[in-house]
Regions:
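A cross-kingdom feature that marks ATP-driven nucleic-acid transaction machinery
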Residues: 1-101
Length: 101
């Protein structure tokens, strides 16, 4: 995963009005923990989820967060469309940049 790709997501989150920080949680590290008014959102960014190992790395930390705030995995590969997993929303980069959450 290129740092530049995470920067694109970071800049878009700021543009959408979120306060953004890296999440060091008991569950592990989340790419971004975002706050806007009283809304909190967790975001992981990845290129492609092609293996179970990658899926566990990207979704696992979000699964271990024991609250009801929205959780997103933003992926960069334009060829992949996946269903939501355990309430975690799988969102393409293009869709995120055009529509946000």
């Amino acid at each position: 995963m290129s740092i530049d790709n995470k920067n694109v997501v970071y800049q878009q989150l700021l543009r959408l009005g979120y306060g953004v920080r890296v999440g060091q949680l008991q569950a592990g590290e989340v790419d971004f923990v975002c706050m806007k008014r009283k809304k909190q959102v967790y975001v992981q960014v990845c290129y492609l989820i092609a293996t179970e190992e990658t899926e566990e790395r990207e979704f696992g930390v979000l699964r271990r967060i024991a609250d009801n705030h929205p959780k997103y995995v933003i992926f960069l590969s334009p060829l992949v469309k996946r269903d939501n997993i355990e309430g975690i929303i799988h969102l393409g980069m293009r869709e995120f940049l055009l529509k946000g959450f």
